């Protein structure tokens, strides 16, 4: 939501919450206006005894306050004897040997039976509202929470914020700076203000600092101590903000609350971004149980619409639009979360049922009331005791109580990994290697290109096209260079820049790249047409986007060939922006096709330039070095096993990812073999990956069912698959039209003197391959215009059909 039209926040001395009383210790009371439990019927008591003249010493503070409020009946010193009334005599029942206790009253027998039964423990009582320490708290309220235990500054809560110029707090209207969040009297600003300005307002000191001028802010008078407000403590990570989910009282009388934490942008994995507001918070999925004693007072976290209208709602108002996942470190709009259907929670987490397990609040020292035994197993769970700490987030659940997660045994956590287990974890494709061998020359060229583009003031026409077969380290090399340049930037040896990474596979359509670029620069989401308009103005020298508009922008586009459209307008716009004066844009494109610029329109290929970088396939020595560098310090492979896997993959495609996958699968085979045989480290020869494990992994990877289907295809089916690989590599696209594929097949058959098939025959074979999920086909109504796509990597087709005895000429096209 655009908050640029939000009026500046006025600080008119209005408090957002009542002051806490200083006298009287904190005594929690249940709000009687919203009772959640009916008062149970008390057990019969003995006849009252005449009270003495001296007051009885109360056993608790609660009881003493109750005795002072309740008037005591005064009795006379001379007791008055009641008038005796004649009683009817009853015949005593005859004793019976079978029922010796029949003469006792029935009520006495019930009391005796109750004393003999074990007392049931009290259970926690849930409340909708709780009056605690002079404040009323309910579920759904936002509150400040102490972050440090025993901090004296947390108890300091000034009535109103002081002016940053005169350092006095009065009833005069104050205006807040949107940069430093400081309060200023209208008369103290130079020049003085007559009314609160609309829109964003920055104080003169922040404006001077933005302009690069050296300015000294006013200092408080000598001997005056500045007291920070709760808002300032929260934004400086000295307090927490939380949302109350539920309230209850434990059997020991202590009040607790389950809260959901808020965090400031600095506490996220991404840190504070330029688009974050100064008062912005993120709601998290982190839940915790805290004592009511740690809660200070209310604050108000509002939605964007509410925050826009809250121009005069005090100093404890904050803005929240997203929820932050502390596990996956991603963001989601609260509006999208609120629109989702609510799922039914576990019965143990439902609000308290007022009909069961009531704990009396007015008679804590009396005997436990009898309770009906619950029928649900969830109510029989025992609650853990809570430690008395103000700043510890104990009882974190993260919502795991809804799925009944179990605790991992300690022996599993303390298990020491073997060399084979370490090798399996290291060889994962998702594991980031410590170094990237065999690509030093290419990385130096990329680094020199980026540094030259950054040092150039105008960055005119800087485009770099990187191509190569899959699995040759193109993307990883560029990202390694950018990480190295980032360290130089942090040390102050490089000019500041912005880096944007986009993968074409993650875009729903090529036009969505405009939205991604604009959101990375501004932090706002708009449609792709508006984003294209704003980006064109930005790179043309018009209206700039973001606060870091003058910094160079390095745009990395992976899978560049997926941005091709019918008129190629997307690629034209992206490659045309760097050619404009003062655009400060550098484009690095990565694709698998070598001759992609030649296939583009002349106006696009001319803007792409002639600076290219080719990543050739790895040979077996380079693959062996890559695997050895990953396994450095882990003695889990035989040298011959690594060399055998490297030679096998280098003969096929030179894909490093395929080599790592084979070695990882071989390590799994070896680990399973060792655990099944029960060998220890004494027999070291069988505790490492040997040639047999590599052979088994290769057979599993290259002898998969779909590869067997390719090998057993008819003659024209094999020709169609090889022709698809050839066309996809030549065009650089992910799909091919049937008419182009058929023309290629007919041309090959004519050159190699094969029988020419008809279009219907080729179409039937494509349908058969589609039924086996070897290729993906569109609906058959399009006939010759339908698009075809390989469902498996082209390396599998190469491995399966490179040696076909019935079609020996097919290998020259692979």
From Swiss-Prot:
Residues 433-804 are annotated as: Necessary and sufficient for ORC complex assembly. Zn(2+) 1 binds at residues 177, 180, 203, 206. One of its GO terms (biological process) is response to sucrose. A zinc finger (PHD-type) spans 160-209. Residues 339-349, 360-373 have a biased composition (Acidic residues). The keyword Lipid metabolism does not apply. Residues 1-15 have a biased composition (Polar residues). Induction: Reduced expression upon sucrose depletion-mediated cell proliferation arrest, and accumulates after sucrose treatment. Induced by gamma irradiation. Residues 218-335 form the BAH domain. Residues 157-181, 197-201, 310-315 are annotated as: Histone H3 binding. A motif (Nuclear localization signal) lies at residues 105-112. It is found in: Nucleus. Belongs to the ORC1 family. PANTHER family: CELL DIVISION CONTROL PROTEIN 6-RELATED (PTHR10763), ORIGIN RECOGNITION COMPLEX SUBUNIT 1 (PTHR10763:SF23). This is Origin of replication complex subunit 1.
